[in-house]
Regions:
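Beta-propeller domains
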Residues: 1-746
Length: 746
């Protein structure tokens, strides 16, 4: 069955993105005493090419990935392998979060892999409805997975946050994503143990996504937060956000309204029973009239609330790991609520400030409620997408909150605003802010819209892609060269934040003395070949200086098969375009390789006044057809320096290694290539995302815990009897049917 892609010349050109990212294993590996549901023991990884593991490796690397859903299409010859985005509509970041832990604590025995799906209460609801109660079933809707009766899944598939509280011996670990409460996991068993904060502590993204008119509230509401909360080990505080907004843009309502109309027409043409069976109506005429009037008032009130500009909100949340969460609503100086137009994918923290940003991971209503993935809607959906969709905002809007304002006796705090040219998804902050100087490290994702993904409607029926499967679900590629930025904000003025200094790198002209920004030529012009699509980052934790000296970045590069004409047209007139759009098209067709680099940030005291403090000092360019992702810094045991561990994809899942490997680099010498490569026939990643490293793991001993039944009971008791019984049978006991024959309740 297996065949090597080396013999397939279709995959030799640089523009062919590795198809191995399209499949993923949902198998859990682990000790049975830690995870009774584990199918196999921890996986001992193999070392390629007879090389040795670096002796200085230590601790445990955690990587997270979306791994499809309970109803994802599986491979014919192996039901454990699924193709999460094969429907042509679902993005790769819609799926259950799988935690991968690589143990480097006993190198004499080898490197072992333990995996586990983050099983929140809504996971058990998803599994049970898929097998046993299809009228409640969850379905993929863009970035979300939603049930019309139960609400929105919290899939926890994006990031981690280690937390070391002073009173505890071991680090605790949060698992996160953008649209759900963070959860704490046990670092040894990998079980998702408890959410942070009670459900009632978190405000829904919008009233309509917590409770539809004329229906009881969803048991699982949509909560928007940050995939990258922060922890201050000096004060023992975790910080995150809870945000939401009004649905006040009329055009964004076109899609759900139109599809509601199409659905109504279908139901008239093909009537069928749906939903809950209603008891015979015993009301008299006046009771019915009063009920209709009450429902009309309720409907109008719900719509007014949903479109009210005061539905915009941002809360800063703090938590000490043992008590209830604290929260403060953030406003402008005039008292109006802050409106986040895209998302708050990442926040920052310094010793005196919380840094909030409207990040370039746009979260639009047309993505929340997209079309059904049915062929009959395809042309309408394509027309609507072109009409409704918009590019991400070209600037980074930042809000600064002073930590001393976060007092227990106040409910609102004022933020000061500053706008930095060019958009950003990921950024880091120096912890130290001497003289109220805040240093930000931004990866400007110039004309790179990671919230857009490859869909079936992006291609005509005649496009067979050279016989290769389309990259459905994959994020689209960059449409301009990206810039890496370092900014110093002056926060001394009580009213206004100013940009005191800005440094940028990324365009070849900025780096002529820099040998790691060599030429990529188009029409005789030279551009840096490294800074195309800054994806994920790594760094050494807690530098003694309190500021970053080196940040490691993985870059996507440019690939012809994750280029779409719709995306190109949307960003053709990008505000800060550095490279002409037509030349970007040519560069993408030729291909720019994925790479891993080290960006050095010089101390300002060592520079002349106009000298750029940013320099690419080391880089590794992956071979044709290889894609590197999810770098993680691991400090070297018993010495200085360290290693970069990352995931590398190539070829297809039909290779003996599934096209998935773990590469280990010397962090001080990326250019020399990997020290060793790890693999296993059963190692099968989807697109991996963020990572973390812990020096040791241990059974969780913290007492903080929110019981599932007590958390949701106030919502469940408002539901019809069928849903109340469903929660008692499946969700509260964390019960998962293995097949349809397991649906009976003992």
């Amino acid at each position: 069955m297996n065949k090597s892609v080396e013999k397939d010349d279709k995959l030799e050109k640089n523009s062919s993105f590795p198809r191995s990212v399209l499949s993923v294993s949902r198998v859990e590996f682990g000790l049975r005493e830690d995870n009774p549901e584990a199918k196999y023991c921890p996986l001992k990884l193999l070392v390629k090419d007879g090389k040795q593991l670096p002796s200085g490796l230590q601790g445990h690397v955690f990587i997270i990935s979306a791994t499809g859903s309970v109803d994802s299409k599986s491979r014919d010859d192996n039901k454990d392998i699924v193709f999460p985005s094969s429907d042509g509509f679902t993005p790769f970041y819609n799926g259950d979060g799988m935690v991968y832990r690589f143990d480097f604590d006993n190198l004499e025995e080898g490197v072992f892999l333990t995996t586990r799906i983050a099983k929140t209460p809504c996971y058990y609801a998803d599994a049970a409805t898929n097998k046993c109660q299809p009228n409640l079933r969850f379905k993929n809707r863009g970035i979300m997975r939603m049930s019309d009766e139960l609400g929105i899944r919290n899939q926890l598939n994006t990031g981690f946050l280690p937390m070391k509280f002073s009173q505890e011996d071991n680090e605790r670990l949060l698992i996160t994503w953008d649209i759900g409460r963070p959860y704490e996991i046990d670092t040894k068993t990998l079980e998702a143990v408890t959410p942070v904060g009670w459900d009632r502590d978190w405000r829904a993204f919008n009233p309509l996504l917590a409770k539809l008119p004329l229906q009881p509230p969803f048991p699982f509401k949509l909560v928007q937060t940050s995939a990258h909360p922060c922890f201050d080990e000096n004060t023992g505080e975790m910080f995150t956000v809870n945000s939401g907004r009004s649905l006040s843009t009329f055009i964004a309502q076109l899609r759900p309204v139109l599809y509601w109309a199409f659905g109504l027409i279908d139901s008239i043409r093909n009537p069928s029973p749906r939903g809950f069976q209603k008891a015979p109506d015993q009301k008299n005429f006046f009771q019915k009239l009063a009920a209709a009037f009450k429902q009309t008032i309720h409907l109008l009130w719900s719509l007014l609330q949903s479109f009210n500009i005061f539905a915009n909100f941002v809360y800063v949340i703090s938590w000490d790991g043992k008590e209830k969460i604290n929260k403060w609503q953030v406003t402008h100086p005039n008292g109006c609520p802050i409106a986040i137009k895209q998302s708050m994918h990442q926040i920052g923290l310094t010793e005196d400030y919380v840094v909030l940003m409207d990040t370039a991971f746009k979260f639009l209503l047309e993505e929340i409620l997209p079309a059904p993935n049915e062929p009959k809607y395809e042309e309408i959906e394509k027309w609507l997408s072109n009409l409704i969709d918009r590019p991400q905002l070209p600037d980074s809007t930042i809000y600064i909150v002073r930590r001393t304002d976060l007092k227990s006796d106040v409910k609102k705090v004022v933020a000061r605003q500053v706008v930095i040219p060019r958009e950003t998804t990921h950024f880091l902050t120096d912890y130290k802010n001497p003289n109220d100087q805040i240093t930000l490290h931004l990866a400007h994702v110039c004309a790179w819209d990671v919230a857009e993904w490859i869909r079936e409607i992006d291609f005509s029926n005649s496009d067979n892609n050279g016989g290769l499967p389309h990259m459905f679900g994959m994020t689209v590629g960059p449409l301009d060269i990206s810039r890496m930025g370092c900014y110093v904000l002056d926060a001394k003025d009580a009213k206004q934040i100013k940009v005191a200094r800005s440094d940028l790198t990324g365009v070849y002209a900025d780096n002529q003395p820099n040998k790691y920004c060599q030429d990529t030529q188009t029409n005789g012009k030279e551009y840096c070949k490294y800074t195309w699509g800054p994806a994920l980052y790594a760094y050494r934790e807690n530098p003694p200086s309190g500021h970053f000296e080196n940040i490691y970045w993985s870059f996507f590069g440019c690939w012809e098969d994750i280029f779409t004409e719709e995306g190109f047209q949307m960003y053709q007139n990008y505000k800060y375009r550095a490279i002409p759009a037509d030349e970007v098209r040519q560069l993408t067709k030729k291909g720019i390789k994925s790479n891993l680099l080290r960006l050095h940030i010089a101390d300002l005291d060592t520079l002349e006044a106009n000298e750029n403090r940013l320099q690419i000092q080391d880089a590794y360019e992956f071979d044709t057809g290889y894609f590197g992702n999810s770098p993680q810094f691991v400090p070297r045991a018993g010495g200085t320096g360290g290693y970069i561990v990352c995931v590398v994809y190539n070829g297809t899942d039909e290779q003996p290694d599934n096209g998935n490997e773990i590469w280990i680099f010397d962090a001080a010498d990326l250019k020399s290539g990997p020290l060793c490569k790890l693999w296993h026939p059963q190692l099968n990643f989807g697109i991996s995302v963020h990572t973390t490293w812990l020096s040791k793991i241990g059974k969780r001993t913290a007492s903080y815990n929110i019981p599932v039944k007590q958390d949701y009971e106030y919502l469940v008791k408002q539901q019809p009897q069928e849903i109340q019984e469903f929660f008692n049978e499946w969700v509260y006991p964390k019960r998962e049917p293995k097949d349809s024959g397991d649906c009976s309740v003992s």
